[in-house]
Amino acid sequence: MYLVTNYILPIFIRIWLGLFFGFMGAGVGYLMGALMAPTSLFFVVTMTSSVLTCGLGSALGWVSFTSSKTSIALILISGVLGAFIGAGLGWVIGKDVYIMGGMPGIAELSGIIKGATVGGNVPPIIIGSIRIFRRGEL
């Protein structure tokens, strides 16, 4: 029972928080980019802003505010970098997998958002799990 309450349950709660904040951040970033982007740079601005906020939101689920500043910075940077890598993979895979007629651009958007959310959560999950199991730091 000690293993479940002190190690396993916090990991699942933080994974859920990371996914929740990641999707919410992606939505907020997309709206910010869509409202502020000029027409010629619409795709670049909306995707960059949604991926950046998605990575920050995903990492926010794993930040422990009692940690050192370097540990917090490592988690935030790894979340953003993971989100950019995941968004790139989601964009490439999304064009081929999601075929929706009459909705141009929605396949890329869906792949980018899903890839950024998953990619933004993987590095903080690894770092946070190591931190929980090695140091017992939640």
Outline where the language-model segments fall.
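Residue-level signature of transmembrane alpha-helical entry/exit and packing/kink sites
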Residues: 10, 14, 18, 42, ...
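Transmembrane alpha-helical segments of multi-pass membrane proteins
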Residues: 16, 20-21, 71-89
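Canonical alpha-helical transmembrane segments
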Residues: 50-72
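N-terminal signal-anchor transmembrane alpha-helix
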Residues: 1-42
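Alpha-helical membrane-associated segments of multi-pass integral membrane proteins
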Residues: 14, 99-138
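Interfacial non-cytosolic loop connecting adjacent transmembrane helices
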Residues: 33-45, 89-118
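Alpha-helical membrane-inserting segments
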Residues: 24-36, 56-64, 85-93, 97, ...
